[in-house]
Amino acid sequence: MVLCLCVSLVVACNPAPEEGTPNTPNTPEQPTEPEQPTQPEQDSRNELVAQKGYPSGVEVYYFKNYYEESSDDYCSGYYAIVDTKSNPKLKFNAVYVENDATPSNIFASFAGGTPLLATNGGYFWDGESLSLLISGGKVESIAAQYTYPSYEGKQYTACPRRAAFGVHADGTMEATWVYCCPDDNNRPYSFSSPKGNNEKVGVFTSTPHSSSSGKLWTPQEAIGGGPMLLKEGKNVAESNYWKEVLHSGGTAALTYQPRTAIGYTNDGKIILFVCDGRKMNGSSGYTLPEVADLLKGLGAVWAVNLDGGGSSVMVGKDGKALNSPSDGTQRRVPTAVVISMEN
């Protein structure tokens, strides 16, 4: 399948860090011969429409991309590029809600400045967050320490390291694998890989990861999900889907679904992405490797998948959903991402 995208930016890839040394964002060592992404063929039916009314440093686009020239199937959605360096008043906020709410309601009640955009956040079950969330330097929700995958008819216990995106106090951005270590009061530790599990072949680590093999992770704001979609510009979505033990949970990486994702570029721009699926507005959705390819084409070097399916929504500056959630209405969620501007 040829994936036709309305993007044209390219990005260099950086060398992989050694195990036990989490990546250091925004100051990567540059390779001598950077790999360049292969640009897909363009379909004349594709659409890319800039949304008006956002302040300097925020660009929001509607896209509609056909899968193949011979096909009438397509994916549509929205993405936003947020440049906090060009406009220092712009802020990334990870928001935790004790009594879950729709992203539009979270947007409306946001008190940390003027909200401009919001998306749903990490995974949850029965209103309880299953993903890491750090707000104002405080851990509001830890990442799931245990999950219970099935392989060949048998249920196992696994301790997954899962992807998260964070912004540090100095403004640097980082995507890494996180585990909240019981041997240090469940504080989040960063790891350079999801090492230890592979749901595809039935290999699982049931012993909690030790803080001694990671690095204490202390961003000011962070949202967790998984899997990691891009690592140093390389599409790692499919392999990490299995290694982060997300198949049994219903993430459905290799089928067309509504998706939400977040990434960042080498020069420190945040990219938020949401696509519709399940034929809402005719959109089939994307696989996770396709989302990774699109984000890479926009310049992202690291990217993290967030909760998708019926949860996927992007709220615009007027507080209303830009896309069309597949449930027909917005789901109530315990975590969200809000882009705001200081008053």
Predicted regions and their residues:
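Short glycine-rich loop/turn motifs
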Residues: 74-79, 162, 224-226, 256-261, ...
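Second-shell loop/turn segments in exported
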Residues: 92-97, 216, 277-281
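Active-site-adjacent helix-turn-beta-strand microarchitecture at beta-sheet edges
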Residues: 128-253
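Short acidic-glycine loop/turn motifs at beta-strand connectors
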Residues: 83-86, 166-174, 230-233, 264-268, ...
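Sec-dependent N-terminal signal peptides
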Residues: 1-6
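Conserved, well-ordered active-site substructure
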Residues: 128-154, 240, 244-302, 306, ...
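Zymogen propeptides
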Residues: 14-22, 33-183
